[in-house]
Amino acid sequence: MGDPSKQDILTIFKRLRSVPTNKVCFDCGAKNPSWASITYGVFLCIDCSGSHRSLGVHLSFIRSTELDSNWSWFQLRCMQVGGNANASSFFHQHGCSTNDTNAKYNSRAAQLYREKIKSLASQATRKHGTDLWLDSCVVPPLSPPPKEEDFFASHVSPEVSDTAWASAIAEPSSLTSRPAETTLENNEGGQEQGPCVEGLNVPTKATLEVSSIIKKKPNQAKKGLGAKKRSLGAQKLANTCFNEIEKQAQAADKMKEQEDLAKAAPKEESIVSSLRLAYKDLEIQMKKDEKMNISGKKNVDSDRLGMGFGNCRSGISHSVTSDMQTIEQESPIMAKPRKKYNDDGDDSYFTSSSRYFDEPVELRSGSFSSWDDSSDSYWKKETSKDTETVLKTTGYSDRPTARHKPDYEPVENTDEAQKKFGNVKAISSDMYFGRQAQADYETRARLERLSASSSISSADLFEEQRKQAAGNYSLSSVLPNAPDMAQFKQGVRSVAGKLSVFANGVVTSIQDRYGS
């Protein structure tokens, strides 16, 4: 026995799927199932087919009714003897009404139904062989689809039914047949007696009655038809003036615009009133400012100093701004750099600068004249000599100040510098300012002086003297020898001693309290 062709498979499934119960999924009820379980002979949707695949082929064997073309005759017989209706009735008879897939197809009812489908399919295969249809597979006749009622056809159709029209047509036919019979009888008897004119008016009455019946009913139908059309809202326009309709529409638009304007007017009035109130508040504030006599400049100054009216939480302010005046500095003078006397070190009492040496020393000829105005000329001469010694020892004369002119002024004429150094690749500052010759002469003299020595140091070459140690400097070598300076020195020493004693006391107290 060969396998069925693809056309046979499509034909069989087309007929099986035409059954109403097979048009929905057996498990979930989805429409148009395209998969089938051969083991139970039921149709399934794609989702339920996946759950059947997870059960295993020993419980449910799944195939597609559209994609698979390698069906066997035994599998087709299983689908023909089965069906959704037979399976659902069998499961209900055996009390299996659960929707759980695992519980449903592992139950006793499912096992019995599998065996039943298998036996029926094997019998049908032996009996029918390769026939497409089975005797037991009865398909109910396809009922024509119900026609949808046409709304317009129902309203347009006449009110008189078909039976009424048939009776109306039958009546005139009977009426017409009767005068015909009478005319025949009259004609037969008229061969001897002659024509009879008594019944001449009868056919005319009959025809009049028939015509009246036929005419009345269509007229009634037309009246009813016209009434139906009016109920649908279709009206015939006659003798209408479109200009009047347009004027009415324009008038309606104008009325609508007026209503919109009337609604918007209160909103605009509220906005205008709020603006007026805001302007009034501003005017009141301006009047208050004018009363307080505060100009723009004073307002800024008061805000900067934190005395503005906006910063006053209580609303009370003082009149300090009324007396404010702006002071401009015409020619600001830069402060002179201060020279500390103890830059190079002092006695063993000091290791850092003190506030007693921060005051600048006025290096003038009469700086110490205020010490004793009643002293004689000899004392004044001595003080002037002391100031000169202080200048020499402290090196104030060597310090460059703003009053000192530079040793070498740059060449004013740029043409001379271009002519002089036009072809030179590199220029030093000594060459540009004319210090090269002097430097060369000094270096030659030093080299000639040190030519006989075995070793030369940088200090010997450049004649640099080693700076004295910080401990060699004393306060007496820096400060001028004056009686006030001696007293000042004594006071400083006493203060330093007190500070040292205080520091020692603090240290000992800390050690006693917290331990060494």
From Swiss-Prot:
GTPase-activating protein (GAP) for ADP ribosylation factor 1 (ARF1). Hydrolysis of ARF1-bound GTP may lead to dissociation of coatomer from Golgi-derived membranes to allow fusion with target membranes. The lineage of its organism: Eukaryota, Metazoa, Chordata, Craniata, Vertebrata. It comes from the Eukaryota. Pfam families: ArfGap. It is a peripheral membrane protein. Signal peptide: none annotated. Residues 243-264 form a coiled coil. This is ADP-ribosylation factor GTPase-activating protein 3. Gene3D superfamilies: Arf GTPase activating protein. A zinc finger (C4-type) spans 25-48. One of its GO terms (cellular component) is cytosol.
